[in-house]
Amino acid sequence: GAAVGPGRGPYTDVSVSSGGTCYGAEKAALERFSQGLAQEVQQYGISVTCVSPSQVVPTPGTVFHNLVSGIDDPKGESPDLMAKAALLLASEPMEKVTGRVTYSQQILKEFGWITEGKGTGVDSDKPGSGYSQI
């Protein structure tokens, strides 16, 4: 998707739809901002992390735009997984998580909260953002 860049050019696939460049740039800026802020405020005991869903979370917006068909779509991720990832990042010691840019199932699997995962950050063909690499 647009959140993860197209990789190194030149590009041969001219069928890619437009509109993702600004979205992807904003996501990249948010990831870099989060890491910079984490470094600046860690001395005050403040942790800053950034987490994205490994798969599309079924919401009225993602259903409307046909990214998923509904709550039971196998391409989608349960909102519970995002909630668990946020809980993990808030409850683990700051030294283990501050400055992390990660995906929900990636971090849950890494810390043993789930045994299986799928999607960005977990599947070998979907590594995610360069900032999220372990």
Name each model-derived stretch:
Residues 16, 59-62, 110-112:
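Generic domain-boundary/flexible-linker signal
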Residues 22-26, 63-65, 76-80:
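Short linear motifs at secondary-structure transitions and domain/linker junctions
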Residues 30-47, 76-88:
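Generic detector of contiguous secondary-structure segments
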Residues 12-15, 62-71:
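Short glycine/proline- and charge-enriched loop/turn segments
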Residues 50-51, 67-134:
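C-terminal helical subdomain
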Residues 46, 52-66:
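Short beta-loop-alpha junction of Rossmann-like oxidoreductase domains
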Residues 1-43, 53-57:
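Catalytic loop of short-chain dehydrogenase/reductase
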